[in-house]
């Protein structure tokens, strides 16, 4: 991945840039549609391509719960599973530590999540988060 500044404003901290990944080039600032579970509601990958979307935001925690890392891994990663050849930005699931705090227990070693889907418990450490990202090929 490579980032370069294309222009900046001398009177402020504003700037434009270009992020180059193996999957696409993204001009910044950028509108990034949210596909929490790997899909953007109401829009197909073809629709996103027609709109010149070069990056989608997804969420590691939600992908882990549904459809699950095993299914994504068996399909050779999130890009192939989604039939999406552009860039995907995923977060680590850290936001859910706080947004779902009433269902979580934070320890010195990690976070015990209680699934909002079925109540099952899942313990996430930084290493577990990286393992999930690796399994879905991000």
Say what each PLM segment does.
Residues 1-31, 77, 98-102, 118-121:
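N-terminal amphipathic alpha-helix/helix-capping segment at the start of soluble metabolic enzymes
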Residues 39-50, 124-131:
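Short, acidic/polar
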Residues 45-47, 66-78, 102-105:
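Glycine-rich loop at the start of a catalytic domain that most often binds anionic cofactors/ligands
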Residues 78-127:
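A gly/proline- and charged-residue-enriched helix-loop-helix capping module
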Residues 33-37, 61, 93-95:
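Active-site beta-loop-alpha junctions enriched in small/polar residues
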Residues 24, 56, 91, 133:
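Conserved, mostly hydrophobic/aromatic
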Residues 26-27, 34-40:
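Residues that scaffold, gate, or flank divalent-cation-dependent active/transport sites
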Residues 136-138:
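Conserved small/polar residues in nucleotide/adenosyl-binding loops
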């Amino acid at each position: 991945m490579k980032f370069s500044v294309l222009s900046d404003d001398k009177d402020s901290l504003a700037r434009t840039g270009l992020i180059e990944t193996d999957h696409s080039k993204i001009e910044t600032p950028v509108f990034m549609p949210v596909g929490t579970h790997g899909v953007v509601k109401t829009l197909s990958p073809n629709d996103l391509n027609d709109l010149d979307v070069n990056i989608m935001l997804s969420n590691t925690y939600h992908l882990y719960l549904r459809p699950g890392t095993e299914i994504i891994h068996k399909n050779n990663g999130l890009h192939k599973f989604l039939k999406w050849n552009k860039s995907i930005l995923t977060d680590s699931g850290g936001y859910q530590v706080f947004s779902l705090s009433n269902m979580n227990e934070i320890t010195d070693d990690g976070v015990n999540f209680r699934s909002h889907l079925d109540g099952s418990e899942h313990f996430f450490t930084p290493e577990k988060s990286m393992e999930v990202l690796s399994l879905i090929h991000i």
